[in-house]
């Protein structure tokens, strides 16, 4: 690879072709360079703080509310405010920043499209550059796509509001280096989206809106507040022009929701229940605690007390501060089989009804075919209102740390373990092949599901847990099942698809991250090394 330097501070390893030159303009690169040099050292300190915090929990401590910040939790204050075009978010659709998906999502019967550079995108260089071009074209109203049959996809006149989800603090952008280290992917995504689109967004009465993933502390939220304020000052924009919704999808963050809202109060408009990553984080954070091992992932549903407490506390905290409380993802995919489709819709409706009844202001779907059914539930719940900010849940008893940490009963089954293996291997294979959003067994899977699958098995091995049939989960048992399930995958997909894919590499990575002595933080980190 040729090293191409287009900035005094940053080095780019990829040749700057026609696509790159549209996005990596000299002024855009200068802005990115300023952000990287100013904010990367503190980002590195924040990642080091995560390691120290986890070491304390591994040694026996449990996450808890922070005594030093009690005054923030107990005093009365609210966030700065919510822009008009974000006051109604009853249904949001999520998906990667691929051209056809961007058009279909913006045209769906939803209020918001969360365009994703994170868990549903495998961030190869071409995908992140194309993603920036696609969002720029969508905002300018010029995006179109033609399929092989000649069908043209274009935006309808009144598309959904666009929110951009950037990569988490831990993810690097390896194709750009600063001082011989990959720059933060989060700053790469933020800088280029903001730089190219802020003027057009403001001109049409919207703004630069972001979703922030994987936050673990209020200090990380404060870092984002500084990044946003720097960008606003650099472009002579009023404070609070940039707005963010932050995902509460890690166990440490659930104890710091007031503090996170307070640290980002100029810019934040809401929090979101990132339920699948939250379950993954629960397993990962409490991995050394044998009394907090979860059962099969299929039985860990939002009705379980520890997850219901998380949802209720998020709603109560957000609405007290004037912020939105967004519900979690419905990962189901509609089916062409009418009986299966009825089952899917009933599952989704029950889940979304519970969220609406709890007081959520809106919710997430992964497929436009669910939009009408979910919209209908929230239309009825809102009854003419735009949101449920008035639902304060003041009558609720306080949610305690013990409730948030309480494991849930349930079986660990051989079928569940085998299903975990098949889903994780197929997802990893797709991800390292460049596809981060994958339909598997009727669910639209992203990285969170594979993370739950592999961390569950790691923890069962680590604590020598037994399956319901009496078998102890060991590395040897896992390796045996992995070999057997690879044959099942081959049979399900067919020899041609299997041989053309990267299933052997995916199985090796699954084996490595599931049997390692120490639990690897995110499968996307070793996975990224296998991505172009």
Q: Where do the protein language model's features map onto the residues?
A:
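Expand to "…catalyze enediolate/carbanion chemistry for C-C bond making/breaking, isomerization
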Residues: 2-532
